[in-house]
Amino acid sequence: MSQAAETLDGWYSLHLFYAVDWASLRLVPKDERDALVTEFQSFLENTATVRSSKSGDQAIYNITGQKADLLLWFLRPEMKSLNHIENEFNKLRIADFLIPTYSYVSVIELSNYLAGKSDEDPYENPHIKARLYPELPHSDYICFYPMNKRRNETYNWYMLTMEERQKLMYDHGMIGRKYAGKIKQFITGSVGFDDFEWGVTLFSDDVLQFKKIVYEMRFDETTARYGEFGSFFVGHLINTNEFDQFFAIS
């Protein structure tokens, strides 16, 4: 049996994707529609207060294409807090006009593939804590996709030795480092939580960097032989004070 990688786990993560039911929303009188939007704004401003206390974070993006219109990403210390947020969100009047198109449940994760030997408690390391319990950037663009490590008769990631996996992940990581300062990456583990094994969330002020890094990594052995991917979602930052314009119907 191959040695399993150990992980450090941080905040729990919930990506929620919605399409707006514009046809139904168009039938709502403007004053009622304005009230729906105001209630939605207040809800998100209230859930965002965790950032100041460093007990979670969140991001809101307008997704490009027909897979979704909105992405709400929540990070919290406990899974049940994500349940509470989702339940309260579903009670909002605006939820009657938002159609769920996708969701992803996971937890911020760091593996030990590239970690050196140390007697230090990693959870007390400031650099590691900042990655496990992050303050999300307000970058212009976001890209999210789920992924698996392939396991079949020809290529099975889980049958490789720890040393083989460490070498592959080192080479893989070297590509990622080339994009430092251009892309901020968050890996969330989802084995036992969702249909894929990991979620990858990328932030950048230059949307083209997503294409560049994903394409370059296609030639990396870790991805070429062992990577399997779900759908990609790309979107632009939207602030709650822009909701009036976003939901406006002339």
From Swiss-Prot:
GO terms classed as biological process: heme B biosynthetic process
Cofactors named for this entry: Fe-coproporphyrin III
InterPro entries: CHDC, ChdC/CLD, Dimeric_a/b-barrel
Pathway involvement of the protein, from the record: Porphyrin-containing compound metabolism; protoheme biosynthesis
Residues engaged in binding Fe-coproporphyrin III: 131, 145-149, 172, 185
Protein's job: Involved in coproporphyrin-dependent heme b biosynthesis. Catalyzes the decarboxylation of Fe-coproporphyrin III (coproheme) to heme b (protoheme IX), the last step of the pathway. The reaction occurs in a stepwise manner with a three-propionate intermediate.
Family: Belongs to the ChdC family. Type 1 subfamily.
Protein name per its UniProtKB record: Coproheme decarboxylase
Species, as recorded: Staphylococcus aureus (strain MSSA476)
